[in-house]
From Swiss-Prot:
Main localization category: membrane
Lineage per the UniProt record: Eukaryota, Fungi, Dikarya, Ascomycota, Saccharomycotina
Membrane topology according to the record: Multi-pass membrane protein
Protein's UniProt name: Iron transporter FTH1
GO CC annotation: endoplasmic reticulum; fungal-type vacuole membrane; high-affinity iron exporter complex; high-affinity iron permease complex; membrane raft; plasma membrane
Gene Ontology MF term list: ferrous iron transmembrane transporter activity; iron ion transmembrane transporter activity
InterPro entries with a match to the protein in the record: FTR1/Fip1/EfeU (IPR004923)
Record region (Disordered): 44-66, 433-465
Length: 465
């Protein structure tokens, strides 16, 4: 059997396109949750007994560090993080107020340190729970779309074959045009990755810091909505299901003229490549090399989209020519005269047929190559690039000014309000997190005793803090 019986480049690239979008979204969710909770992703999930971020079972360490902070010299008094080092230094005698402070507030100081450790432990547990929800949502969505898609393709192949052959090029043309539009939008998705990361970060952080949310499963709040408690499961589940079903529809449409045996290998290889890219994106999401890779991948995707757009128009024109020939597809007979509409032809060569000539099928599947170009296919190819360039230019202007000049504001009102809401939510999130940090870590140098209004810690110049 031929190689085309086991592998289809069309199915491979279609499924790769959709699966890449899925893994990128899931990777963004994981990255933002990890950064939002400020936890390390290595130790807590390797099964080691000493997980990073968990509190030490020795509770005396907190008391020792607190005492060491009060015993530290003036040069170390403003650095809380160096209290453990200061404990090893030569101690100085405590004055009366400091002794009163340690005696009267030792339990409170230990409770503050214990609460800080418990907060860190809760973050680790919360991250573990959210990570499981995100991965499980993506996995269940992928499984469900494969089950639905498998049944859809099987029924479509066995029942709709005869109906397909009557208007084959219409179906292929329309689906190619739709696929081109989807790829073009996904290219903007890659180019605007930084903005999308901020958008996802605001949305997900608003869920994390929601007062009504209960992602750790506290039984005292029984009124938590299902959509709030499992929001990190629902988002990747719906995304994976939607994108997966889109891939199945395109595979069932564009690849309908190919054998069923070519689907499994194409889908498995596309999934493997997407998984590798997702892991790479998750680990190196902020590196310069990844940004370069995204730009290169976007350029490659736009080449594919331009080819699909041109091929879609070419398919529609070919079907019109087939209808004029009483339903006989002359392009399947051969490459010579009579196999194409000479009234619409721009060029035609009697070889390099992308429909059946081996390696040229790769260029057809990727770049939309055809050995018989028409006026519509050539104009549509150039028009695609002109529209894309104008769209990117307008988006750059919008990024710079916040709106598009010389365009009625009423047409842009929805986008402007959306951008303002995201910016406001981002500022509120930063303000909220700063309040949390300030409330959980009040400087000890500002604490005052009952008997005096003078701060306990005096700087080296002798002035009170």
């Amino acid at each position: 059997m031929a190689f085309e019986d086991y592998f289809s480049f069309q199915i491979f690239f279609i499924f790769l396109r959709e699966s890449l979008e899925i893994v990128v979204i899931v990777s963004i969710l994981l990255t933002i949750v990890k950064q939002g909770l400020s936890v390390e992703d290595d130790s807590p999930f390797e099964g080691s007994s000493s997980s990073a971020g968990l509190p030490s079972p020795n509770t005396n360490t907190n008391a020792d560090s607190t005492t060491a902070f009060l015993q530290a010299g003036p040069s170390d008094g403003n650095a809380i993080g160096t209290s453990a080092t200061a404990a090893n230094n030569k101690s100085r005698p405590l004055n009366v107020e400091e002794e009163e402070e340690i005696y009267e507030y030792s339990n409170e100081l230990r409770d503050q340190d214990r609460e800080s450790d418990e907060h860190t432990a809760d973050n680790v547990k919360l991250y573990q729970k959210l990570k499981i929800q995100i991965l499980a949502g993506g996995a269940f969505g992928l499984l469900l779309c494969m089950l639905i898609g498998g049944a859809f393709v099987s029924i479509f192949y066995h029942i709709g074959t005869d109906l397909w052959t009557l208007s084959e090029h219409y179906y292929e043309g329309v689906l190619s045009l739709v696929a081109s539009v989807i790829i073009s939008v996904m290219g903007l998705f890659f180019l605007r990755m930084g903005k999308l990361r901020e958008k996802f970060r605001v949305k997900l952080a608003s869920i994390i810091y929601s007062k009504d949310n209960n992602l750790l499963g506290n039984k005292t709040q029984k009124g938590v909505k299902f959509s709030e408690k499992y929001s990190f499961f629902i988002l990747p589940f719906i995304t994976t299901l939607r994108e997966g079903l889109e891939a199945v529809v395109f595979i069932g449409g564009i690849g309908i003229d190919q054998p069923l045996s070519s689907i499994p290998l194409s889908m498995v290889l596309a999934t493997a490549i997407s998984t590798v890219f997702g892991i790479f994106f998750f680990r190196y999401s902020s590196s310069l090399s990844l940004k370069i890779c995204l730009v290169v991948a976007t350029c490659f995707l736009y080449l594919i989209a331009a080819g699909l757009f041109s091929k879609g128009v070419w398919q529609l024109e070919l079907q019109d020519y087939v209808n004029k020939c009483n339903g006989q597809d002359m392009s399947e007979v051969g490459n010579g005269p009579g196999s194409y509409d000479i009234s619409r032809s721009v060029w035609h060569v009697n070889c390099c047929n992308g429909e059946k000539d081996g390696g040229w099928m790769i260029f057809t599947a990727i770049f939309g190559w055809t050995n018989s170009a028409t006026v519509g296919s050539v104009i549509s190819y150039n028009a695609y690039w002109l529209v894309l360039i104008c769209a990117l230019k307008l988006l750059m202007i919008e990024e710079k000014y916040g709106y598009i000049p010389y365009l009625p504001i009423s047409w842009q009102k929805k986008r402007i309000m959306k951008r303002l809401s995201i910016a406001k939510a981002s500022l509120d999130l930063k303000h909220h997190t700063s309040e949390l940090n300030s409330s959980t870590s009040e400087p000890d140098s500002q604490r005052r005793s009952k008997d005096s209004s003078v701060p306990l810690i005096i700087d080296s110049s002798g002035s009170a803090n």
